[in-house]
C-alpha cells in the first residue's frame, strides 16, 4: 500500500489592509506598563556604585602588588662599549661597578627624586585602596558621591607621581650612559608602565562613577539605617522601609477598625429589633 504523504500548511489569518498605512506589518510586542519604583531604582543605583567601587579596588590592589613585586628587581641592562661587560641596575638595586650609580646622593639627584616619587605614588594608592575597602562596610557616610571624587583625585595624583618617577629614572640612566655604555630596559620597567595605565583607569572609572552618582542622589524618603550583607558577603545592601508602606499600613488598620465598629453597630440594631 502506498503511504500518503502528510503535508503541513501554515495558517495565515487575513489582515485588514488600509491603503497607505503599513503599520499592520509591524509586529507589536507586549510591554510592561508598571514603572520601577523610586526605592527600587535607588537600590539598583547604590548596588551598581558599590560594585564599581569593588572593581576599582581590585584594580588598585593589583597595581600596587605589581609595583611592590617589580621594585626590588632590575629595570635596565647596561652594555660597556670597551669590553662588552653586561651590568644590571634598578630603582632600588645597584650594579656595584664604577660606571654605575651608588646610594650616595649626587647632583642632579635624579635617582633620589625618582625614589621619593615612587613612595609618594604607593602612598596615594594605598590611601585610595583603603577608602574603597572601607566603602564596602555598612556605613551610611561612605555611600556619598564625595568618596568617588576622592578616589579619582588620589588615583590621578598617584599616576602623575609614578609618571614623573619613571621619567626621572630614564634621565638618570641617560646621564650615566652618555659615552661609555649603552642601555636597554627590561620587562620589569614596562610592567611599571602597566601600573601607570591601571592608575589612570581607576581614576577615570571613579570620576565617571562620581558623575553618575550625582545625577541619582539618594532619596530622602527612604531610610537606610538598617543594613544587611549582600549575597557575596562584601558589599552593603540597604534594608529600607518606605514611608508609603507605613502609610498604607496605617490606612489598612484604620479601615479594619472602622469595619469592626460598623459590624458592632449592626449587631446592636438587630438585638434591639428582636426585643
Curated annotation (Swiss-Prot):
Membrane topology according to the record: Multi-pass membrane protein
Residue stretches spanning the membrane: 60-80, 116-136, 151-171, 193-213
Highest taxon of source: Eukaryota
Main localization of the protein described in the UniProt heading: membrane
Cellular localization per UniProt: Membrane
InterPro entries from the UniProt entry: PMP-22/EMP/MP20-like, PMP22/EMP/MP20/Claudin
Key words of the record: Membrane, Transmembrane, Transmembrane helix
Name assigned to this protein: Transmembrane protein 202
Amino acid at each position: 500500500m502506498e503511504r500518503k504523504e502528510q503535508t503541513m500548511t501554515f495558517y495565515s489569518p487575513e489582515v485588514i489592509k488600509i491603503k497607505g498605512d503599513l503599520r499592520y506589518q509591524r509586529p507589536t510586542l507586549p510591554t510592561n506598563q508598571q514603572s520601577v519604583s523610586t526605592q527600587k531604582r535607588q537600590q539598583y543605583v547604590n548596588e551598581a556604585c558599590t560594585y564599581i567601587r569593588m572593581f576599582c579596588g581590585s584594580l588598585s590592589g593589583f597595581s600596587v602588588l605589581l609595583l611592590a613585586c617589580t621594585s626590588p628587581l632590575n629595570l635596565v641592562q647596561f652594555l660597556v662599549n670597551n669590553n662588552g661587560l653586561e651590568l644590571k641596575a634598578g630603582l632600588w638595586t645597584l650594579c656595584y661597578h664604577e660606571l654605575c650609580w651608588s646610594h650616595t646622593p649626587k647632583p642632579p639627584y635624579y635617582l633620589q627624586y625618582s625614589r621619593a616619587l615612587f613612595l609618594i605614588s604607593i602612598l596615594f594608592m594605598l590611601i585610595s585602596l583603603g577608602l574603597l575597602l572601607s566603602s564596602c562596610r555598612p556605613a551610611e557616610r561612605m555611600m556619598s558621591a564625595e568618596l568617588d571624587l576622592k578616589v579619582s583625585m588620589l588615583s590621578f595624583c598617584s599616576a602623575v607621581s609614578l609618571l614623573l618617577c619613571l621619567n626621572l629614572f630614564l634621565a638618570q640612566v641617560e646621564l650615566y650612559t652618555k659615552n661609555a655604555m649603552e642601555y636597554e630596559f627590561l620587562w620589569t620597567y614596562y610592567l611599571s608602565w602597566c601600573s601607570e595605565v591601571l592608575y589612570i583607569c581607576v581614576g577615570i572609572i571613579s570620576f565617571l562613577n562620581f558623575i553618575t552618582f550625582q545625577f541619582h542622589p539618594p532619596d530622602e524618603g527612604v531610610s537606610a539605617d538598617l543594613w544587611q550583607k549582600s549575597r557575596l558577603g562584601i558589599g552593603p545592601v540597604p534594608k529600607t522601609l518606605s514611608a508609603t508602606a507605613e502609610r498604607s499600613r496605617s490606612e489598612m488598620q484604620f479601615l479594619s477598625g472602622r469595619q469592626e465598629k460598623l459590624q458592632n453597630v449592626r449587631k446592636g440594631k438587630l438585638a434591639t429589633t428582636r426585643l
